[in-house]
Amino acid sequence: MKEYSIFYADDDEDDLMFFEEAVYSLSGDEAVKINLHLVKNGENLLEVISQTAANNSVVFMDLNMPAKSGFEHLEDIRSNSLVATTPVIMYSTSADKQNIEKSKKLGANYYAVKPSSFRDVIKLISKALSLDFNTDTAPPNDFLLNKLAI
């Protein structure tokens, strides 16, 4: 059985529930176990990742959160030696090129625009879990994870 840990930081309750349902539908596969850690605004994200991150961990991070933006949380992750190599996917409703480029510049592994359909969220999460972040690096044309998940 393959085991994964997913950390999802978002301040929107509906987005958290939607993502959680998608993860649980994937967890129904007996060959996959997913430990999901929901963080409501990112404030204790570093602490949660530091305490529970393991191999096959990935962070999905919303850009627009109160107090600190997803960009600021990404900078915190990349500057903390305990969690700096944890894969991060910036996960936002925004498809703005500046946000995508800034995410890449700050060290995100991928950027994903939040899909509106449940099926597409499942495909996106599945694609993220299929990546080997130890060897896979996002070439400039493939930084947008949505393109790879279709």
Stretches found by the model and what they are:
Residues 3, 72, 95-110, 128:
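Alpha4 helix (beta4-alpha4-beta5 surface) of REC/receiver domains from two-component response regulators
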Residues 3-24, 59:
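Conserved acidic segment of CheY-like receiver
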Residues 20, 36-58:
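Acidic, metal-coordinating helix/loop segments flanking the phosphotransfer/catalytic sites
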Residues 41, 69-75:
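Acidic catalytic/metal-coordinating carboxylates
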Residues 65-66:
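Receiver (REC) domain active-site loop signature in two-component systems and cognate sites
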Residues 114:
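A Lys-centered signature of the CheY-like receiver
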Residues 120, 125-126, 130-150:
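CheY-like receiver
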